[in-house]
Amino acid sequence: MEYGIIPPEVLLGAYAQGVFPMAEDGEILWFSPTQRGIIPLDERFHIPRGLKKALRKKPFEIRFDTAFREVMLGCAERDGTWIDGVIVESYCALHELGRAHSVECWDADGLQGGLYGVALGKAFFGESMFSRKTDASKIALVALVERLRERGYELLDTQWMTDHLRTFGGIEIGRKEYLELLQEMLRGESVIDSLRLPK
């Protein structure tokens, strides 16, 4: 891997096949879970009642793609992280190509939380999120869903399912069903085309 990063064409090619990387003990491991976590972008998406109250207070300014690297580093702060230097540089390279994006929660004290992920076809692959202040990552997730709906996306892939994501309507589907859905979302999308820089 040149310069210690996963080449963008390799990374996007993996996503197109339902595979994603995680770092462990200095190695890059590749995963394709038998049960895949997704958050439906239709009426099944649910905002928990307590979070609705927080949203009404508008505690953060939401920004997109203004601090991608900082969001990644925030996600890497927690113990047992799978985000190492290779992962950071690899996704920053995708971000420069317009294929990886961040959602950020800011206040007067700075960046307080957010998330990042990869966009391909009508699918968005959520990678990781973090919070420095209460509800920041949850509010970023709601902002992401709103933006994905506006842009015509139909799949939010969370990779793994957690109790936290279930509160938003997250579900698990089998690998076969997921791959069929993914191919539908990528119809007409070319990994080669997606690597062309915007004019």
Predicted ranges, named:
Residues 1-199:
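N-acyltransferase acceptor-side catalytic subdomain
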